[in-house]
Amino acid sequence: THIYSSQYPARSIDLPMAMTLGRICINPSPAAQKHIHNLYAGLGVGSLTYSEGTNDDLNKFFWLGQDWDASTEAEASVFDYARYFIGPDLAADFTAGIFALERNLIGPLAENEEIDTTLKMWQSMEERADDATMRNPRFLMPLLRAYYDAYIYRRWLHELDVESRAYDALKEAPKRGSSRALSRTRAILGEARRKPVAQELKRRCEELYEAVYHDEG
């Protein structure tokens, strides 16, 4: 699944998410897949799916399920995936969490307060997951995305604040002089690196990336 430079890019994705996730990323998108599949379903008979990795595992499963019966609701297809690959205990919450991840990529990042709610949903599942589930890449990948989105969201808010204060410092040049204003501006901009935010989320992302890498074998 490619979120840009593709036939069906992610619609309305904000620039910081697109730049940090990259073209090929963990991108479960059942609502979009349902729309695209059914839009063209009458023009062919079935399909062949392929993958450049496991990042789009759910989307492949979903698409083939729609080939089997295009009238199946998107939520039902994801629930079938969750019940089979994750287990019945978490299936309903996993399904809701997948759709929440898809919504994380819609619209201006700074205004998407649902990202924190999405993380809490996945953290609740993480707390209840058994050892086997916590070694299951099909669970770990969307869990990782929830942490990743929350990290980028907090970092983006922080860096927007840094940028705003840097502009304010530049506006002081007529009063303070250009050299002093520039020095102050550089110092403020440096806060993005000197005072990074949400490091606990970043560390959890790194742990989950490592786990996915090893559990995929």
What are these regions (language model features)?
Residues 27, 61-62, 150:
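General secondary-structure edge motif
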Residues 8-11, 60-62, 109-116:
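Surface-exposed beta-strand edges and their flanking turn/coil or helix-capping segments
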Residues 51-56, 71-217:
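C-terminal non-catalytic alpha-helical accessory regions
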Residues 44-72:
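Aromatic/acidic polysaccharide-binding cleft in carbohydrate-active enzymes
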Residues 1-55, 171-175:
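Active-site core of glycosidic bond-cleaving carbohydrate-active enzymes
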